[in-house]
Swiss-Prot record:
One function term, GO molecular function aspect: ATP hydrolysis activity
Protein name according to UniProt: Methionine import ATP-binding protein MetN 1
CDD domains: ABC_MetN_methionine_transporter
Reactions mediated catalytically: L-methionine(out) + ATP + H2O = L-methionine(in) + ADP + phosphate + H(+); D-methionine(out) + ATP + H2O = D-methionine(in) + ADP + phosphate + H(+)
Record-stated family: Belongs to the ABC transporter superfamily. Methionine importer (TC 3.A.1.24) family.
Function as written in the Swiss-Prot or TrEMBL entry: Part of the ABC transporter complex MetNIQ involved in methionine import. Responsible for energy coupling to the transport system.
Keyword list, A-Z: Amino-acid transport, ATP-binding, Cell membrane, Membrane, Nucleotide-binding, Translocase, Transport
GO cellular component, one term: plasma membrane
Origin species: Bacillus cereus (strain ATCC 10987 / NRS 248)
Domain ABC transporter as annotated: residue spans: 2-241
Length: 346
């Protein structure tokens, strides 16, 4: 559906060239929600703007729906862009016209008939649950409602791809969740492919199927959201994953506890259950675990939990207990054994 091949972007400034996007390749499958996450300056905005050629890449190919956009004429590109919708952090609504006109006007400019425009405006305003506000002006809407209008406007061209450029970053947490639920609904009911960028792990875990992590203009890690959460490799990825959990254990406390046992992280997903398995391990082996911190968060279609425990007992018994937990499908990290590297949390 979307393929970037060795795409780079260099900006020329008074101080010289700035490589905002290094040679990058990635694929987005038809019908999936693909997220790109990174801190400010990572290059994610440049990347997503290259997808529809709002930014023309310095090198590489952008292939959408089997078309290489970098080879198209201006007229051909304009036509191809009609199948690529985009929503932004700032909504970009016309303040002097109604909600209805904000959606209808771009359709008129595209040469859509009046009957078809009326049909589409009603259809997509109903999908975003704003049909009753069709005669309202943007100034009368909340931030979340404005973003819903922007989504309806993007969908009214009936694109096959929807690009989301930090669409929820200006919204409060509750409104963000409602917009994410709407995007997930659109993806599942309409089948539209969504490529989004964000700096918030909550966005990735709630609706994405796969994710790419960016830093300094390059993709440093990518995979399914499940794999990224359960087995992050790059230091930046680990920071994002840890940000989804509230666990912060002071380093001096960790060092003190490590003199009387091991600090271990237990991660479990889906049907695996950390606490019951831990209770069974306590009965089977001579170990004495104390839960220091725990949290369960929701990925797109399943729960993911993490427990940080202090486990006391003889080393052999601890090893046997940790091996048992792994056999139950629980990911074990930390400690002084071969179950994983010692991990500091904080």
């Amino acid at each position: 559906m979307i393929e970037l091949k060795n795409v780079s972007k260099v900006f020329t400034t008074k101080k010289g060239n700035v490589e905002a996007l290094k040679s990058t390749s990635l694929q987005v499958k038809k019908g999936e929600v693909f997220g790109i996450i990174g801190y400010s300056g990572a290059g994610k905005s440049t990347l997503i703007r290259c997808v529809n050629l709002l930014e023309k890449p310095t090198t590489g190919n952008i292939i959408v729906n089997s078309q290489d956009l970098t080879t198209l004429s201006a007229k051909e590109l304009a036509k191809a862009r009609q199948k690529i919708g985009m929503i932004f952090q700032g909504f970009n609504l016309l303040k002097t016209v109604t909600v209805y006109e904000n959606i209808a006007l771009p359709l008129r400019l595209a040469g859509i008939s009046k009957v078809e425009i009326e049909k589409r405006v009603e259809k997509y305003l109903r999908i975003v649950d704003l049909f009753t506000r069709k005669d309202a002006y943007p100034s009368e809407l909340s931030g979340g409602q404005k973003q819903r209008v922007a989504i309806a406007r993007a969908l009214s061209h009936e694109p096959e791809v929807l690009l989301s450029d930090e669409a929820t970053s200006a919204l409060d947490p509750e409104t963000t969740d409602s917009i994410l639920d709407l995007l997930l609904k659109i993806n599942e009911e309409i089948g539209i492919t969504i490529l989004l960028i964000t700096h918030e792990m909550n966005v990735i875990q709630r609706i994405c199927d796969r994710v790419a992590v960016m830093e300094h203009g390059a993709v440093v890690e990518s995979g399914t959201v499940k794999d990224i959460f359960t087995n992050p490799q790059h230091v930046t990825t680990k920071k994002f994953v840890n940000s989804a959990f509230a666990a912060k254990i002071p380093e001096d406390v960790q060092k003190e506890l490590q003199t009387t046992g091991e600090i271990v992280t237990l991660s479990f997903i889906g049907n695996s259950s950390g606490e019951p398995a831990l209770a069974v391990a306590t009965k089977r082996f001579q170990v004495y675990p104390n839960i220091l911190s725990g949290n369960i968060t929701q990925l797109k279609h399943e729960a993911y939990g993490k427990l940080i425990i202090h486990m006391q007992g003889e080393q052999n018994e601890i090893n046997r207990a940790l091996s048992f937990l792994q056999e139950q499908g629980i990911i074990v990290e930390g400690g002084r054994t071969d179950h994983g590297k010692q991990v500091l949390f904080g």
